[in-house]
Structures are given as C-alpha cells and as structure tokens.
C-alpha cells in the first residue's frame, strides 16, 4: 500500500510566519474519504472525517512529542505512534490530516487503501522515522 504525504500552502505560510513545530499544539484527524487541495485553509475543507463514534472523536487527537532535525534540509518528526482504541463496530480511515490547533492544515496523508480497526482493536498511525515531511 503506497502512502502519499502532501503539504498544504497554509503550512508553508505558517512556517514562514515563525510557526514552531516543536511547541505548537498539533492534531491528527482521520478521514474515511479525502482529497488533497493545496489551497485549503481548514483541515475540514475537503473530505469526510471519520464519524464521532466507536472510539474515534471528531477532530482526532493531539500528536506526541515532535522534533525538527537537520541544517540544510529540516525533517519534521513525531516521536511516538498515535493510537486509537476502537469500540463497538470500529471504524475505517483512508487518510489523515495533520493540523495546527486553530484548524490550519499542515499535511495530508493518503494511506492508499482503507485501514480498519474492529471493535476492541487498535488503530495505530506509526510515523515515518525519517520525518513526516521535510523542507530544504
């Protein structure tokens, strides 16, 4: 399954405006259907967020500790996996969006296929060791 990550124009604008990757509150939301539009100004602009039920809460959840490594090319990293525990019928996601707490989207992650967590199981988003995205 090919995973594709794309940056939003608003993320680049936020970075240029001294947005701090390591101290800002950043969330990840799951989508059952989603498309990428580089000019979207809100994480909810395109796509259908996973329904608020069965272990998923609208808006997703805050991601863990973040670091930024490198000098010429900077890689934005998230140190721990983000995990949801499915209840009831569980839920399915096809994409995720990272966004700043104000709702400004940073990047769109397309999993390339539906990923399902059955009730009682976990749905884990393991972040790439090399970084979620890089600039440079």
Q: Across the structure, where does each feature detected by a protein language model lie?
A:
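Small cysteine-rich, disulfide-bonded extracellular modules of the LU/uPAR three-finger superfamily
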Residues: 1-94, 100-136
């Amino acid at each position: 399954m090919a995973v594709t990550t794309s940056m939003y124009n608003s993320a680049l604008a936020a970075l240029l405006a001294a947005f701090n990757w390591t101290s800002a509150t950043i969330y990840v939301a799951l989508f059952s259907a989603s498309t990428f539009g580089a000019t979207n100004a809100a994480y909810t602009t395109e796509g259908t967020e996973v329904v608020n039920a069965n272990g998923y809460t609208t808006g997703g959840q805050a991601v863990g500790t973040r670091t930024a490594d490198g000098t010429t090319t900077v890689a934005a990293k998230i140190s721990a996996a983000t995990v949801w525990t499915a209840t009831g019928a569980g839920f399915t996601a096809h994409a995720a969006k990272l966004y700043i707490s104000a709702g400004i989207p940073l990047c769109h992650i397309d999993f390339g296929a539906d990923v399902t967590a059955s009730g009682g199981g976990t749905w884990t988003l393991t972040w790439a060791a090399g970084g979620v995205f890089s600039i440079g």
